[in-house]
Amino acid sequence: MNYLLFKRWNDFSGWLVFLIAAFVYGMTIEPTASFWDCPEFISCAEKLQVGHPPGAPFYMLVGNLFTQFASDPSQVSRTVNFLNALLSAGCILFLFWSITRLVRSLLKEEKENLSVTDVIIILGSGLVGALAYTFSDTFWFSAVEGEVYAFSSFLTALVFWMILRWQDESDTVYGDRWIILIAYIIGLSIGVHLLNLLCIPAIVLVFYYQKYQTISLKGAIAAIALSGLLIVLILFVYIPGMADIGGWFELLFVNVLGFPFQTGLIVFLAITFFLLIAGIYRFKKRLINTALWCTLMLTVGYTTYAVILIRANANTPLNENAPDNIFALKSYLNREQYESAPLLYGKTYASEPEYVPEGDYYKVKMKTGGAVYRPNKEEGKYKVIRNKEEVCYTQNMLFSRMWNDRMASSYKSWSGGTDGGAPTQKENLTYFFTYQLNYMYWRYFLWNFVGRQNDIQGHGEPEHGNWITGIPLLDNLRLGDQELLPESLRQNKGHNVFYALPLLLGLIGIYWQWMRGKKGMQQLSVVFFLFFMTGLAIVLYLNQTPGQPRERDYAYAGSFYAFAIWIGMGAAGLCDALRKKKSSVLHVGLLMFLCLLIPVQMASQTWDDHDRSNRFTCRDFGANYLMTLPDKGNPIIFSNGDNDTFPLWYNQDTEGVRRDARICNLSYAQTDWYIYQQQCPLYDAPGLPITWSKDQYQEGKNEYVAIRPELKKQIEELYQKHPEEARDSFGNDPFEVKNILKYWALSEKQDFHVIPTDTISISIDKDAVLRSGIMLPDSIRHLKGEDLKNAIPDKIYISLKDMRILTKVDMLMLEMLANCNWERPLYMAISVGEVSKLKFDHYFVQEGLAFRFTPFDYKKWGNVKGDNNYAIDVERLYENVMNRYKYGGLDTPGLYLDETTLRTCYYHRRLFAQLAKELIRQGDNTRARKVLAYAEQ
């Protein structure tokens, strides 16, 4: 077969694999948003909003294009998920072409005629490797939801195929165009995910092997070192450096020359592009000219971040971190809101802050960083609000892996440490190999190519989330008799067994590649560095702590992609070995067919736990939180984590559910940008009742205030001796929340910047309470008129005993509670953990998936039954559960429910149980039976 005919067959087979993958992923996509970050990404794509740092502007732009095809708001998420399905199929397409190109170059010289056996081996190896990756656990999971990892995988596959394609034209005048295009794609990939940068070592190695006549180990090491330097320069110099220099220009043009905001940044970008273009025309030497072209195209791709800056200035409903100027954008890009882990040297969990003398005292030594600028729109200038500071620690360690002081006991359980002191280097390395490498990488790797025990997140226990082969002898030796596990685990849909066949085929592929002489060794090094950089190198960089909130296998999809190349090579190696024994074409074809059965077997195992069709749980459960709220009064609901916030945002932003309500994420409520956004109206709801000025909630101001109960007696004495003066200074009631905040906590006077009591109060507007529809305690529900009004307490009292400080979030919650005046309903999602030491639960009444703040201490009034600390409004709960809530298609036979979905199902199931129990307690057995029957459905 000549080259042109083979090329047609290769193209046809590649597109066939693309169609297979697109069909599989299209059939199994989730028809709406999935849990974790997906609802946020979909909302950001639909309205070009600003998501969490460091953002994904290019993904947003492409996603926004696809959302234009949605027939109505409920279909927006389906279009974004379908985009991911197509991108994932595109990744499979380029994987196929990469495998066939690599295998062909090992079998024949370029453009040499091929035998039928050669064609079977080449195309068959591409099919085996590509389909094995198609049906692998991690990649399929990302392919059917609206996250960035499918796009990142597509770009990884694209640039790897491009550098292989460049080899065909490397010696022509057109060859450099492929290198320049790769630079552009890498620039665009910065606007999707930084994982794509990790392809650079493989790209540089291909370039080295192709362009240099004399290949040596020293040269290969130099190429790898150069590629590592390129990654460091792009990641730690180019990306933040562009923002740094843009900031210098901005300060010059705005603060010194008096131009409007953003002028300096625009001038800097104009100068940058001018210099690059001028350099391209000035320097014609091929190496310099190509380098300038690559820098230009990298910069053009990187400028997708202008979308973040533009949309942040538009103050979109989702505008996380509000990066509306170059200084905020730099912080956004650097992910400064997240805790950073040491890489090569740093503290351990036992490290203590370093102290330095200051006068008669010692203070914590701080490392001072750069200034933090904020735009002052009244003055038209940037102002320094503070300098960045970092605590200096003693007892630092080389290659510190056990660094988080909140995880000391978990570190010890993984490292074998028992003495409670600082970790030794042996324990440090034990933790690194046992947890970070073995448990958080190799376990995921083996999930994909050996088998998976179940889809329950594991934390080291033998019954959850381990890898298994499906061969009882091997599995029982490692994990105990698997037949003794509960049926729920044995029948778990995430139980996938591949009998280690994909792994064995991949190992054969590595061996075959290694044995193919010089060219094979070169290929092996290229694929190995793609495998290493997108897998083990990420493990080194992330430095993860134990107890991750979810499994992290999605971060290593690129590494599994590289191993899929070796799986394809393994099929080629087996067939090539059979051919050398002078077997017929039929025998080789039959063996390749048997190899193809491996991905078929993988599909038979993984289909049931990757088919998300007909599953609407994330959308409906998010809507249920909002539907818990009353229809009037512009209610407010406090949320906290990803899965009790992002689905709510998605419902409100994208599908228009309950735009009269406000969602307040308490994990953001300590930040100045979020407080400002919450003060502003949104859709049909007014801002939150927060009266603080920008100066009062600015970053670094009023982060916490000390509680000084010993001052209470002095204040009471002042009110006794000088009542008029006291009232003028501290209000009529000095311990009422509004007065505490006004005269004490937010005071500019340092001596008054305290909470002078351990018991604070909030006044109760009794008429407002009666109008609000809040459930009244049983003991006063029968009263009427003035008797009822008089029975309502005048104040509620909140104890601060055993507390040393109030945080900014605490103070904001107290102010909102006081300012809502029982007219604007205030709720706390039931999934919110302990975000505050304030004890409100006695004042809670449960109406569904949220607790309502009330002025009644139901425990004292006798409404709290059993072990609960809160009351239950049976009528509202019944209405919500039976009539207002939707349940995401849970009644669909065979619907796949993963662990995250099941966890949210448990919240709903608990509601049914609580409601039935309360109805039975009230003697309403008829409705209790209806509730239980509905739950069973």
Language-model features, listed with the residues they occupy:
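Alpha-helical transmembrane segments of multi-pass membrane proteins
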Residues: 21-32, 234, 452
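Extracytoplasmic catalytic/substrate-binding loops of multi-pass membrane glycan-assembly enzymes
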Residues: 29-41, 51-63, 78, 319-321, ...
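ER/secretory pathway lumenal C-terminal domains and tails of membrane proteins involved
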Residues: 80, 85, 100-108, 139, ...
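Start-transfer (signal-anchor) and selected internal transmembrane alpha helices
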Residues: 1-24, 90, 113-127, 266-300, ...
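Alpha-helical transmembrane segments
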Residues: 11-24, 126-132, 181, 224-231, ...
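Short hydrophobic/aromatic helix or loop-helix immediately within or flanking a transmembrane segment
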Residues: 44-47, 52-78, 82-86, 93, ...
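Membrane-interface alpha helices of multi-pass inner-membrane proteins
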Residues: 44-47, 129-131, 179-191
